């Protein structure tokens, strides 16, 4: 996995920018763990993940396992997070499927293809 992650506090939320390639289920899980580590490090509750320059797997199957991993193996505090992930338009379908799975499991994780829409959503959340 060739991936860089940079983080900074913005007014109202934590901004995480990812760039690189994620090709396998294992790399997808590792990407999520790296993001969660950043969230814990900053103590953030509202997070914008800019994955526009991240190449993601297009198969839907790994995302089922990923969401199950969130619910079963991450700390319960994960349910208090509000995450807006922004992907390139070619990943819109897979990101929307991920969002549907997350929301169905009680997570406030939403997918966008616009940074402006994602940041506006986060700032409007209580």
Where are these regions (language model features)?
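Amphipathic, Lys/Arg-enriched alpha-helical "gate/interface" segment within cytosolic domains
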Residues: 1-126
């Amino acid at each position: 996995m060739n991936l860089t992650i940079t983080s900074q506090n913005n007014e109202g939320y934590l901004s995480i920018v990812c760039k690189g390639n994620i090709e396998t289920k294992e790399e997808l899980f590792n990407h999520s763990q790296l993001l969660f580590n950043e969230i814990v490090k900053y103590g953030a509750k509202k997070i914008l993940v800019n994955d526009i320059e991240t190449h993601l797997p297009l198969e839907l199957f790994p995302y089922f396992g990923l969401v199950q991993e969130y619910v079963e193996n991450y700390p319960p505090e994960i349910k208090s997070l509000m995450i807006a992930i922004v992907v390139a338009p070619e990943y819109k379908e897979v990101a929307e499927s991920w969002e549907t799975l997350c929301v169905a499991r009680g997570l406030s994780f939403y997918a966008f293809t616009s940074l402006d829409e994602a940041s506006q959503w986060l700032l409007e959340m209580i």
